[in-house]
Every structure is written in C-alpha cells, then in structure tokens.
Amino acid sequence: MIETYSQPSPRSVATGPPVSMKIFMYLLTVFLITQMIGSALFAVYLHRRLDKIEDERNLHEDFVFMKTIQRCNKGEGSLSLLNCEEIRSRFEDLVKDIMQNKEVKKKEKNFEMHKGDQEPQIAAHVISEASSKTTSVLQWAPKGYYTLSNNLVTLENGKQLAVKRQGFYYIYTQVTFCSNRETLSQAPFIASLCLKSPSGSERILLRAANTHSSSKPCGQQSIHLGGVFELQSGASVFVNVTDPSQVSHGTGFTSFGLLKL
C-alpha cells in the first residue's frame, strides 16, 4: 500500500497596517493640531481687533460730537435749533461732571496733605483717687471721668502725667480740701504743681496756700493752679499737697490735666 503524505499549507502571518496608512494618520494628527492652534490664535487676534475697532468707533463718535458742537456754535450745517440746544446741554453736563470730579479729587488730595501735616491732639484729664489720703503726691483714678487723647500722654504709677512730645502745654489742677478739719498744726494747706524732668530732677512750677477755718461743719475750699509751660519729651507733672488727709475726693472736687497748645 502506498501512503501519500501531503505537506500542510503554511500559516498566514498577521501583518500590520501598511506604511501608507501610518503616514496618513500622522499627517492627519499634525493637521488637526495645527488647525486647533491656528483657530486659537485667530480667536485672540479677532478679539483684540474688535476691541481696537470699538475704541476707534468711540473716538470717531467723540470726534463727530465735537464737530457737531462747532457747527452749532458757528450756525453751520442743517441742524435745527432744537438739536443744537440738546447737544449743547449734553456737552455742558459732560463738562460739569468732569469739573466736579476734578474738584472732588483736589479736595481729597488737600485733605490728605493737611491731615498728614496736622499735629496730633494731646490732652488729658483725670480725677483724684480716694486711696491717696496717705501720700503727699496725689493719685488719680484710671477710670471714671478719665481722658487721654492718645498714647503721647500717659498716666504713670497713677500719679504722674507723662508726655512723649516736646512742646508748650497748659497744665492745670483743682484741689478741694476741708479747711477746718482738726490737724496737729495750724500750718496752711499748700498745693503744688510739680515737674519731673527726663533726667529725674524735680522742681515746683506753681504753688498756692490756704489757711484753715474754724467753722463747723467742714468748710470745703478749692485751690486752682494753671499755667503754660514748655515740657521736654519724657517729662512728667504731678500734684503735691502738705496734708493729703484733708483732700476731698468726691466727683468733680479734685482734678488734674493738661493740653498741648
């Protein structure tokens, strides 16, 4: 028996897309990307061009408006009297608004300059503290009728008003005391307005005295001191009395203050 052998046919090998297809896809991709970039650039150009055209149109309208005003003033052209009056009214309103805005800006600028050059107001007013009956230097309450305009004047240790700017100050004090209270001596009641310099030295600026009274009940009397003095930066002022136990500390009786001139 003769056996026949047939050789199997070779398997077909899968092949990729042809080279021409790859080139086509590559070119198509490049074309699409280029078109997108070109469209974006054209949109930017068109937007800027439209803005420029809008500005030119506004300038042209302004130019036409000004030419129309000139024609109205000269009586030229075919514009009626009513149209000219309306145009003049619009122009006057425009000029009025411009002048008002200019005047407002000028006032604001002058106000800022004046505000920058203006000296800060320095003032203080304090009332006595009842706990100061045992010390000759009167103490002042940090509450109640207590006024300090800014940080350029401070109340130090409850006793002294210290200033941080050199200048002329009006300094004043009122001390109310009981004139017939029993005392060990009949020496007059003395109140002194004193200055403490930045170096620490002290001196009396003003002084007043009042004699005791024999009337009963207690007869209250007041001593007023006040004057203008030049103070250095860092100087302080305080009030000293000979007998603090006689001082009246009711509201408005005893006070102390200063004002920069």
Swiss-Prot record:
PTM comment: The soluble form derives from the membrane form by proteolytic processing.
Extracellular-side segments: 47-261
Keywords per UniProt: Cell membrane, Cytokine, Disulfide bond, Glycoprotein, Membrane, Secreted, Signal-anchor, Transmembrane, Transmembrane helix
Topology with respect to the bilayer: Single-pass type II membrane protein
Glycosylation sites (chain numbering): N240
TM region(s), chain numbering: 23-46
GO term, biological process aspect, one: platelet activation
Pfam families (alphabetical): TNF
Residues of the THD domain: 122-261
Compartmental location: Cell membrane; Cell surface
A GO-annotated cellular component: cell surface
Domain of life: Eukaryota
Keyword Transmembrane tagged: yes
Membrane topology, Cytoplasmic segments: 1-22
GO MF annotation terms: CD40 receptor binding; cytokine activity; protein serine/threonine kinase activator activity; tumor necrosis factor receptor binding
Disulfide bonds: C178-C218
Gene3D superfamilies hit by this protein: 2.60.120.40
Site entry: Cleavage: E112, M113
Predominant location category: membrane
Description of how the protein assembles with itself and partners: Homotrimer. Interacts with CD28. CD40 ligand, soluble form: Exists as either a monomer or a homotrimer. Forms a ternary complex between CD40 and integrins for CD40-CD40LG signaling.
Free-text function comment from the UniProt entry: Cytokine that acts as a ligand to CD40/TNFRSF5. Costimulates T-cell proliferation and cytokine production. Its cross-linking on T-cells generates a costimulatory signal which enhances the production of IL4 and IL10 in conjunction with the TCR/CD3 ligation and CD28 costimulation. Induces the activation of NF-kappa-B. Induces the activation of kinases MAPK8 and PAK2 in T-cells. Mediates B-cell proliferation in the absence of co-stimulus as well as IgE production in the presence of IL4. Involved in immunoglobulin class switching.
Family according to the record: Belongs to the tumor necrosis factor family.
Protein name in UniProt: CD40 ligand
This protein's encoding gene: CD40LG
